[in-house]
């Protein structure tokens, strides 16, 4: 029992060390309490202000809903009411030019009319003013209403302010600015077709110190301008006294979705943002796209928080000061007292430390001996030193070591040892000896050198073996491929493809050997990157067509960009990576992007992006070690296991590297960074470009394809337009589209799987837009065809047909009616009125048929077909053709 009591007293003793720890714990608790107190006070203040903002938002929303109803009442019932007898006895006073004051018996509200108007507007103003007298009779804050009449474009202002007095000196007063700004806002909203209701930002009435915002509502009237009703809704009576009015802001809500199904959730949502100098508390107004924002400085938050927690905070600070004083006092006292009081824990620690030192000494792979010369005894030694100690004369070893910088060699039992001596810095007459077996180290070094020589020999032998086996396989593989290509059997094509794969693998093995033994040499030539791409595309196009993939070539370099470097190496890199991307992609597309680095014009980046399943981690290891892991495969074969390593090594030979980034299920991006010197521009482009003064209509659905084609054509000097950019009467020379149904006349059909240029109809060609040379050939062929057609059609068109028109006796009627119908075609096409457009085209077709003008009749029939299909680009083209035909007849 006594033993338990003594242990309890020692555990909870009041020694200075224990009291110091208690004070330290108290300081930590007080600091945490202070932080929690401040945080709770700040959160409570923010929560209270958030509730106030929500209440203000509810009040503003209720006011908006009420005055929405009043707006509709004024427009539907009061402004639209016609009472013939009510206009008798009305009187207005002209204050300024186009400014009239309505005289009325009740003076709660006053009304001004701006602009010329009739009696109906005066009567309507009287009714609205009387109605607002009733609504605003008990209000003390200023209210105003603006009514922009769509009938006569007059503006009516009804307000509780003394308008007649304020209007004196109208052009110099603030009322003039307010009325002008309101009229501009209402006219702007009246012209906006997609905006029925809008709100203004928070505004301030200077002489009344009133804050308000404007609710504007538009009412469309057939045959007249839109009518706009605007109310200035004050908020002075909605804001609590402790919140300054100038700190409120009403702004559009960027997060509004437009369908507030849950009204309570929508109105009670509050967001708090901490900016650099202020705190913003905002709440959205339900059924509107606005939100109310209250800005408060950080100083206000700190002052309000300190006022709420001042007494507890002072008490906490006082306790913290006492705890710090006690901690410092008892800490110095405990440090003085423990200097003279021995502790048993020190002895235990020394014992443990000595045991650890003995364990370390016994595990050393060297001999360790610590010798004290004064007492001639060994202080520390391990087994290796104890084994050699009987054969050592430490006195002689010490003397010789002092003469040879502390290092000597000694032979013990025909074994060579190196002995190093160090003098102890703690005990002056104590030496430390380290004994190392030299024979064992020499033997180990010999074995290491022999292993290194054997490794280098094996490496050299492997390289020679791979080179010889590659040379031995190359000739039979080529012979096999040539023989398979000459066969006419049904299986010969498959056999030839497999033979080509074998030849390609042998070539890659030889290239890998040359790169490994550094015997590969670069051949620098001057070449065009675009021409190189035009060679690569046909090589990978069959595999892409076979799998149903889409290929996009996006070359951002200049049209005639010339580079100096190894063309064959770059071609092999692109082929290897694109073939690998085709194999690993089952659906989607493969994109090749070519860019010039912004840092240097001599550095190029080739990016190949696919939409496959991605490359696994094991396949990525093939980037650093050739053919170390298996690769993906499809039903046509396996991906090339040497592609990554060869591409990276060739890119490094070209001064760059290969980078691969992949994501499972999304695809892979292969980035090849190389250095290709740009050719010095000898002569600027002074000559005329290929397609200068040629206008091309590009009707392409895909934005990527449209950008690729537009860049190519503009590099050749053409002007490209789209159906949306084209004017009604604007002509173009060449028509390009990727939709076969849009190719109703001569033009180019763009495709990504065409091997070159193919004729699909008279004056219609199908071309692969990824191949620049094919695109250029197709454009030139189409221009030649169109020039040939123009030579045929330039035969006297107006000869027989003009004579026939004059002989029919209807020439005067033709001149009076047909040009007007052609203008009507342009107008109806601009408004997309297809029904009226069809009637006009049918009427013109009848005129041409009656006069036996067959070309005009055929043009109208084609136009009717395009109208039924709603083909806007085709409609515009044929309207232009009909216009040209009519002008040629006239």
UniProtKB/Swiss-Prot annotation:
GO terms for biological process: phosphorelay signal transduction system. Phosphorylated by RcsC. GO terms for molecular function: ATP binding; histidine phosphotransfer kinase activity; phosphorelay sensor kinase activity; phosphotransferase activity, carboxyl group as acceptor. The chain crosses the membrane at residues 22-42, 309-329. Residues 468-678 are annotated as: Histidine-like kinase. Residues 803-890 form the HPt domain. Residues 1-21, 330-890 are cytoplasmic. Keywords: ATP-binding, Cell inner membrane, Cell membrane, Kinase, Membrane, Nucleotide-binding, Phosphoprotein, Transferase, Transmembrane, Transmembrane helix, Two-component regulatory system. It is a multi-pass membrane protein. SUPFAM superfamilies: ATPase domain of HSP90 chaperone/DNA topoisomerase II/histidine kinase, Histidine-containing phosphotransfer domain, HPT domain. The modification Phosphohistidine is found at residue 842. Coiled coil: none annotated. GO terms for cellular component: plasma membrane. InterPro entries: HATPase_C_sf, His_kinase_dom, HPT_dom_sf, Ptransferase_RcsD, RcsD_ABL, RcsD_ABL_sf, Sig_transdc_His_kin_Hpt_dom. Its main location: membrane. Interacts with RcsC and RcsB. Has a higher affinity for RcsB than for RcsC. Belongs to the RcsD family. This is Phosphotransferase RcsD. It comes from Escherichia coli (strain K12). The lineage of its organism: Bacteria, Pseudomonadati, Pseudomonadota, Gammaproteobacteria, Enterobacterales.
């Amino acid at each position: 029992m006594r033993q338990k009591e003594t242990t309890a007293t020692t555990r909870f003793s009041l020694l200075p060390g224990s009291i110091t720890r208690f004070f330290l714990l108290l300081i930590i608790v007080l600091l945490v309490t202070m932080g929690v107190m401040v945080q709770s006070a700040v959160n409570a203040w923010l929560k209270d202000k958030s509730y106030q903002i929500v209440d203000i938002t509810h009040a503003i929303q209720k006011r908006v809903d009420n005055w929405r109803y009043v707006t509709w009442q004024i427009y539907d019932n009061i402004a639209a009411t016609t009472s013939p007898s009510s206009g008798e006895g009305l009187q207005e006073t002209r204050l300024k030019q186009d400014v009239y004051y309505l005289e009325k018996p009740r003076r709660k509200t006053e009304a001004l009319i701006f602009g010329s108007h009739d009696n109906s507007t005066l009567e309507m103003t009287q009714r609205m003013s009387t109605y607002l007298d009733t609504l605003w009779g008990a209000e003390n804050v200023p209210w105003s209403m603006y009514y922009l009449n769509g009938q006569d474009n007059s503006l009516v202002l009804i307000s509780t302010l003394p308008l007649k007095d304020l209007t004196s000196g109208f052009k110099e007063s603030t009322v003039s600015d307010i009325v002008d700004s309101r009229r501009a806002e209402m006219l702007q909203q009246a012209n906006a077709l997609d905006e029925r209701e809008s709100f203004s930002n928070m505004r301030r009435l200077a002489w009344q110190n009133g804050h308000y915002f404007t609710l504007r509502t538009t009412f469309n009237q057939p045959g007249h301008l839109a009518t706009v009703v605007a109310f200035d809704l004050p908020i002075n009576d909605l804001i609590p006294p402790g919140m300054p009015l100038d700190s409120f802001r009403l702004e559009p809500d960027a997060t509004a979705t437009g369908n507030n199904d849950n009204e309570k959730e929508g109105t009670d949502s509050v967001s708090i943002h901490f900016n650099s100098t202020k705190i913003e508390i905002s709440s959205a107004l339900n059924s509107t796209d606005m939100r109310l924002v209250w800005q408060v400085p950080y100083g206000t938050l700190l002052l309000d928080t300190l006022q709420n927690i001042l007494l507890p905070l002072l008490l906490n600070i006082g306790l913290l000061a006492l705890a710090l004083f006690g901690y410092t006092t008892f800490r110095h006292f405990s440090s003085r007292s423990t200097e003279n009081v021995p502790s048993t824990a020190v002895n235990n620690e020394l014992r443990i430390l000595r045991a650890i030192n003995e364990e370390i000494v016994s595990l050393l792979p060297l001999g360790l001996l610590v010798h004290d010369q004064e007492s001639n005894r060994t202080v520390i030694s391990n087994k290796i030193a104890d084994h050699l100690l009987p054969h050592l004369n430490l006195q002689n070893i010490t003397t010789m070591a002092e003469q040879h910088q502390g290092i000597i060699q000694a032979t013990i039992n025909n074994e060579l040892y190196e002995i190093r001596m160090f003098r102890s810095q703690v005990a002056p007459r104590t030496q430390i000896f380290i004994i190392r077996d030299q024979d064992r180290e020499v033997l180990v070094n010999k074995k290491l050198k022999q292993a290194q020589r054997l490794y280098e020999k094996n490496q050299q032998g492997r390289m020679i073996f791979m080179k010889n086996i590659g040379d031995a396989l190359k000739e039979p593989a080529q012979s096999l491929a040539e023989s398979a290509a000459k066969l006419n059997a049904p299986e010969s094509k498959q056999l030839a493809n497999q033979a080509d794969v074998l030849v390609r693998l042998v070539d890659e093995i030889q290239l890998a050997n040359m790169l490994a033994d550094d015997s590969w040499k670069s051949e620098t030539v001057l070449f065009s990157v675009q021409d190189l791409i035009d060679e690569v595309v046909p090589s990978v196009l069959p595999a892409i067509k076979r799998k149903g993939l889409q290929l996009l070539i996006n070359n951002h370099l200049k049209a005639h960009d010339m580079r100096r470097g190894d063309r064959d190496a770059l071609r092999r890199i692109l082929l290897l990576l694109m073939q690998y991307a085709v194999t690993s992609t089952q659906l989607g597309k493969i994109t090749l992007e070519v860019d010039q680095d912004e840092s240097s014009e001599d550095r190029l980046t080739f990016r190949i992006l696919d939409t496959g399943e991605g490359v696994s981690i094991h396949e990525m290891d093939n980037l650093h070690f050739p053919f170390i892991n298996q690769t993906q495969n499809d039903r046509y074969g396996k991906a090339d296991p040497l592609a990554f390593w060869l591409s990276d090594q060739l890119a490094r030979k070209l001064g760059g590297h290969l980078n691969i980034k992949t994501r499972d299920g999304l695809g892979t991006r292969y980035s090849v960074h190389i250095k290709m010197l740009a050719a010095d521009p000898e002569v600027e482009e002074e000559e005329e470009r290929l397609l200068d003064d040629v206008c091309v209509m590009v009707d392409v659905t895909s934005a990527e394809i449209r950008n690729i084609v537009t860049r190519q054509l503009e590099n050749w000097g053409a002007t490209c337009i789209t159906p949306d950019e084209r004017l009604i009467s604007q002509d173009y020379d060449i028509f390009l589209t990727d939709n076969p149904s849009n190719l109703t006349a001569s033009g180019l059909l763009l495709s990504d799987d065409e091997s070159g240029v193919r004729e699909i109809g008279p004056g219609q060609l199908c071309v692969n837009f990824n191949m620049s040379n094919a695109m250029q050939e197709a454009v030139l062929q189409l221009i030649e065809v169109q020039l040939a057609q123009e030579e045929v059609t330039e035969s006297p068109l107006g000869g027989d047909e003009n004579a026939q028109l004059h002989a029919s006796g209807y020439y005067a009627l033709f001149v009076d009616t047909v040009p007007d119908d052609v203008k009507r075609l342009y107008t109806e096409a601009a408004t997309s009125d297809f029904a009226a457009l069809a009637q006009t085209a049918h009427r013109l077709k009848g005129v041409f048929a009656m006069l036996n003008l067959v070309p005009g009749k055929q043009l109208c029939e084609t136009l009717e077909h395009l109208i039924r299909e709603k083909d806007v680009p085709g409609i515009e083209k044929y309207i232009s053709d009909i216009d040209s035909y009519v002008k040629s007849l006239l």
